[in-house]
Structure formats: structure tokens, C-alpha cells
């Protein structure tokens, strides 16, 4: 798939959705009740993907709603310092806050996240705050599934997708399923399917695709067959330690292994994977190589303390692949 048409456009990628605060436990191997020290980072899947792709050298913009307070200013400055354009970032004027995520790292196999997502600013992004002039400056618009969980954010995202299609902007959909945000699985399936059927690239875990299909134990063959009846050109399905698969509408199948690493935590892998996979496509690499980039980036991030700060450079990704092969 060629993502490099419209080279005259201002942005390679614009991501849409939440930007929040991650407070990651500094003290490892102990429960939250006993943890006294946390480090603050920018979090939220679309923000992390914006950060990850910017660190890889892409020209990136962001659309989302943040709080008009210290946390909101921290997020905006952090992203601007990475040369991420924040013209699409809206400040909430009604006192809503950004989401907070406290992470607990009991062991590499036992990590959890304590979320505060009630009445958060990002889910109050409105359709009126989506600018066609901004979106049409991008080659690719990336949608995060969590932004579909509630109105008015849901309608804002659907408008963004419609404007992307109107202006020949490719749509990438990162399923990003977070159960604490949704009301029920039927609702998730409806809105995930609605966007997936309009997306050119869909990325998610096998479990996330099962949520989209409202079933358990779904098969890749059936998933890709359905999506290729619609807009999809590439479907990426991740299977954890078993690696990941990419399918194309032309009938090709590619596979990449998961790279071994010393795991510190289990979160952040999906965002780094999506960032590096898209970077590979933008760089003109083969889909197989883009899969390797995604797997390597995920391996790097789970070995480090943060998600956003740990997003790797292209040299780090290539070095890990070379070492592993």
C-alpha cells in the first residue's frame, strides 16, 4: 500500500483521540497499596502513536480535547517539544480533566492499570471541533477505538473519518479496546465495525478483533475476508508471543515473530507497534519489514519504564532486528 501519495501535504499522519497522564510506579515488584513513588508521562494510545511516529521522523498532527489546567499544559508542551502539531488540540472550557492512569508493576507477568476516566475531557470532543481544513492536510488519519466509546467524541470521530474519505486521506484504525470505557460489547461491535469498514489499514490483537465481531475465538481468515469486502487494504492481527500477521487485499500473507526481551511491564506495546508499522509503510519498506519494525518497537517499549518516553528511534529498531537475526 502506498502511503506516500500527496507528498505536498503538511502531515504524514494525524492521530485522533485521547491524550492523558500516565503515572507509572517507580517501585517495582510491589502492589499499588505499598507504592509511594510514581513518574509522570503523557499517555493515551493516539497520543502515544503521535509521539512514536514523531520520534521516527514523521510529520505528525494531533486532534483531541485536553483539560485547561496544569496536566493539559504538560501534555501540550510535551507534544510540541517533539514537533507534533497541536493546532487540532482543543481545551475543555467546562472544567473536565484529562484521564489518569496509575500503573502497578508487581512483576513482568503481573501488571495492572488503575484508571480514572469519569467525565474526561477527551470524550467530549465535538463534531464542531473537527476541522476539514486540518484533516485534508494529512496523508493518513489514525483513529483510536476508545474515542468511539461515548458521545460526542463518537460523532466527532465519525465526522473525521467522513472528511478523510472525502479528501483522499487514508484511514488507519487502531482498535485500542479498553473495557472500562464501553457500556457493553454489542455497542463496541457496532461502532468498531462501522469505522473498520471505512478504514484502509486496521491494526489490533486477535482479542480486539473478536470484540469487533462480538464473538469469542474468531479466525483470521474470516476477519480478513469480511474486511476486504469493504475499504481495507491491509489487516494486521497480533497474537502476542506467537507474533503478528498482515493480510493484504491482493491475497498476500506476512508474518513476524515477537522479539525476545527482558520484560519490565506489559503495557505500551500496541502503541509502539502501530507507530513503527506505519513508519515502515511510510518509508517504503515491504509489509514484512514493517511488521518486523512493529514487533521490534513493541519489544523495546515493554522493556522500559514508560510508554511515550520509551518510544524508540529507527536506529534502535533496526539494531534490535539485526541483533535478533
From Swiss-Prot:
The keyword Transferase applies. It is an enzyme of class 2 (transferase). It catalyses: 5-dehydro-2-deoxy-D-gluconate + ATP = 6-phospho-5-dehydro-2-deoxy-D-gluconate + ADP + H(+). Keywords: ATP-binding, Kinase, Nucleotide-binding, Transferase. Its EC number is 2.7.1.92. Pathway: Polyol metabolism; myo-inositol degradation into acetyl-CoA; acetyl-CoA from myo-inositol: step 5/7. Disulfide bonds: none annotated. PROSITE patterns: PFKB_KINASES_2. One of its GO terms (molecular function) is ATP binding. GO terms for biological process: inositol catabolic process. Belongs to the carbohydrate kinase PfkB family. Catalyzes the phosphorylation of 5-dehydro-2-deoxy-D-gluconate (2-deoxy-5-keto-D-gluconate or DKG) to 6-phospho-5-dehydro-2-deoxy-D-gluconate (DKGP). This is 5-dehydro-2-deoxygluconokinase.
